Amino acid sequence: MTQKLLSINDLSILLPTGADRQYAVEDIGLELHAGETVCVVGESGSGKSLTARAVMGLLPAPHVRVDKGEIIFGDEDITKVSYERLRGLRGSEISMIFQEPMTALNPVMTIGDQIDEIFRYHVSMTAKERAKKALSLLVDVNLPDPAKIIDAYPHELSGGQRQRSMIAMALALGPKILIADEPTTALDVTTQAQILQLIKDMQKRLDTGVLFITHDFGVVADIADRVVVMQDGKIVETGTAKQVLQTPTHPYTKSLIAAIPR
């Protein structure tokens, strides 16, 4: 068995008073191992993205917060560590790529400067070493003309180029876990396939555990080792990708699979 990287146990995330339900997620549990892709699948409002944000310590507290349960990374419970420790974990141990990189990237900094900032915060390197490493990362994610892109601003790039840049930043420090929150939703079909392949290739090279958040079982079929299906904040089905895709048991899972374009 490969190394267990993450264990979520009996996690409940409380919503503000007046929300349509008490908990965004309720009593959920899942595990992620090195070199494995676990897809968390569900429609909007299922709680899948808030689960991912809880792992990163990015819940919009105090309005949305962990009410009970634990998120174990290594020998630490992420729900109980200090803000300083969370900042240290983000990027170096656990990284995240988002659905729309235009909102995640800084619009007034070049791609190179944004990668450089990661190294300046986390690693002791000279400016020359940082610049060389940044360029190497852009080469790794198959960006055309990386020497030009390193000096470009986000608005000067295509959607696919921005997402590749985000992946380069997310993997800059060799994290053990990559959380991908619907990273291909805003992309055309061809670019989506390229980004999924890139994530698979990088994962294989780095032995990263990937927690992939999606509403699309077409993506699941392409990338998942194991699947967790969420509906209204609860896990309704879980299993290997083959089990869930070929012999789903829950009506909600069946309806999501039926929505895959043939």
Give residue ranges: language-model regions.
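Helical segment within the ABC ATPase nucleotide-binding domain
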Residues: 193-206, 218
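Conserved ABC ATPase "signature" region
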Residues: 77, 129-148, 257-258
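Conserved ABC ATPase signature
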Residues: 152-157, 161
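A short, proline-enriched helix->beta-strand linker immediately N-terminal to the Walker B motif
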Residues: 172-176
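ABC ATPase "signature
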Residues: 238-239, 247
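A short, surface-exposed alpha-helical micro-motif characterized by mixed small hydrophobic
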Residues: 220-222
